[in-house]
Amino acid sequence: ITSLLVSAYPAAFPVMMAEMASDNAMDNGPLFSVEFQSQEDAYLWQDIVTDTDEDAPQGLWDACYLAIASANHALQAIETMGNPSSLAPQRGEALICRAYGHFILANTFCEAYNYETASKKLGIPYAINPETEVSPDYIRGTLEETFSKIAADIQEGLPLIDDNLYSVPKYHFNKKAGYAFATRFYLYY
């Protein structure tokens, strides 16, 4: 389970996409070229449909759901073993990882959370079970439902995290990292 959780962290982030679409980017003229078409598309506020690299929307979407799938497989394995208390820290980490992946997706692909309108805005599909079929149909749900599920995973997972689980906790959700993520999430919620 512990080894499986290494893959429960997304291998892509929305940083480049967001930066290129912000006022932090500028056109340096014809002598400067971008590495990926998705960067130029984001800069020009065009739909990004050509690239599937990790900095493009499809790459981010796939990386986050791949990480979420790993977290769900870990959670299912723990449940299959009878939810032993010895695996509580791994369960906590898996729940936080699942929440984190969904948060990145919701924060990137949904409208900003507003408690007055969240019940009317589209959220993202919230995957809570390991996949048993290829390309299943998910119900997208509302933004309110998405954020509520993220909050539930955080609230259940945080108390279970144990900093003594790893000899090098820097690359896992330890207590401090878990609470830092929770703090960031609740700034939006």
Where are these regions (language model features)?
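Conserved, well-structured interaction surfaces
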Residues: 37-109, 141, 156-166
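Well-ordered alpha-helical segments within folded domains of soluble proteins
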Residues: 67-75, 126-127, 178-184
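Active-site substrate-recognition loop segments, prototypically the cytochrome P450 B′-helix/B-C loop
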Residues: 25-39
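Short coil/linker segments at helix-helix boundaries
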Residues: 108-149
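Aromatic- and glycine-enriched pocket-lining scaffold segments that form the walls
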Residues: 161-189
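Extended, well-ordered alpha-helical segments in internal regulatory regions
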Residues: 101-112, 126, 182-189
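Acidic, glycine-rich segments characteristic of secretory precursors and extracytoplasmic regions
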Residues: 1-25
